[in-house]
Amino acid sequence: GLWSKIKAAGKEAAKAAAKAAGKAALNAVSEAV
């Protein structure tokens, strides 16, 4: 139903946000070094 679609979208968004945060952290570290 609708709720499972919303939950799935939230999970995907969280995954994308985590990936973006990890990339940003790596960039910050490589620039700091």
UniProtKB/Swiss-Prot annotation:
The keyword Secreted applies. GO terms for biological process: defense response to bacterium. The keyword Secreted applies. The modification Valine amide is found at V33. Disulfide bonds: none annotated. Expressed by the skin glands. Keywords: Amidation, Amphibian defense peptide, Antibiotic, Antimicrobial, Secreted. It is found in: Secreted. GO terms for cellular component: extracellular region. Has antibacterial activity against the Gram-positive bacteria S.aureus and E.faecalis, and the Gram-negative bacteria P.aeruginosa and E.coli. Has antiprotozoal activity against T.cruzi. Has antifungal activity against the yeasts C.tropicalis (MIC=10.1 uM), C.guilliermondii (MIC=20.3 uM), C.albicans (MIC=20.3 uM) and C.albicans ATCC 1023 (MIC=10.1 uM). Decreases viability of murine peritoneal cells. Fuses to, and disrupts liposomes. Belongs to the frog skin active peptide (FSAP) family. Dermaseptin subfamily. This is Dermaseptin-DI1.
